[in-house]
């Protein structure tokens, strides 16, 4: 089973090297089952872990060499922690990574739904869903950790590490990401950036 998952991730990575944007989108939607909204764009070299666990809204841009983690998250019977790839877990969350409409995700962003528990003697995988709401802007080389919700209209400055929720219409930055200022709530733009090659 693990070999099949690894091969599937490899195929999704190879797809990111296809030059034609339209061909990549077709494969992401129909072969890898990523839910991708109308007029959204996934740039060259984007990579996915468990792509079927990812939902992307309309008019959203995913930048070059972004990494999106859609690993399925399963809730433990004790309702205390979350992990994957084990029969002792149940209740899958179907789309653990949800990205809204008109979201701009710059290049080299890393979004994770899973990590390892460093205090576990077995180094167990734990995680939680990540939600990125509408009109969010994420700068280059940002890292978003499991369980984070980034509120509508928020901006995450380049290089930030997001370890906790970001309030709507705020700008955050730093390691770990902290509040910088508020953003205008009057957002009506639509991101339409699809090109044949990108």
Residue ranges and their predicted role:
Residues 25, 46-56, 61-149, 175, ...:
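Flexible, glycine/small-residue-enriched loop-and-beta-strand segment within the central core
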Residues 168-170, 178:
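Glycine-centered loop/turn positions within well-structured domains
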Residues 1-33, 39, 102, 135, ...:
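Terminal amphipathic alpha-helical/low-complexity segments used for targeting or macromolecular assembly
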Residues 35-36, 48:
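Terminal hydrophobic membrane-targeting helix
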Residues 39-41, 45-46:
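N-terminal start-of-domain structural block
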């Amino acid at each position: 089973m693990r070999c099949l998952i690894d091969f599937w991730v490899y195929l999704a990575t190879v797809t990111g090297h296809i030059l034609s944007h339209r061909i990549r989108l077709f494969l992401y939607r129909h072969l890898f089952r990523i839910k991708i909204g109308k007029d959204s764009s996934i740039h060259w070299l984007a990579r996915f872990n468990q792509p079927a666990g990812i939902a992307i809204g309309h008019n959203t841009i995913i930048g070059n060499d972004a990494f999106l983690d859609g690993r399925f998250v399963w809730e433990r019977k004790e309702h205390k922690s979350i992990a994957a790839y084990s029969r002792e877990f149940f209740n899958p969350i179907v789309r653990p990574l949800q990205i809204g409409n008109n979201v701009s995700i710059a290049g080299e962003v890393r979004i994770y739904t899973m990590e390892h528990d460093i205090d576990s003697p077995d180094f167990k995988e734990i995680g939680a869903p990540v939600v990125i709401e509408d009109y969010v802007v994420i700068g280059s080389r940002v890292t978003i950790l499991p369980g984070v919700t980034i509120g509508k209209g928020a901006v995450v400055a380049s290089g930030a590490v997001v370890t906790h929720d970001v309030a709507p219409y705020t700008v955050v930055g730093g390691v770990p990401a902290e509040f910088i200022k508020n953003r205008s709530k009057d957002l009506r733009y639509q991101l339409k950036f699809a090109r044949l090659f990108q």
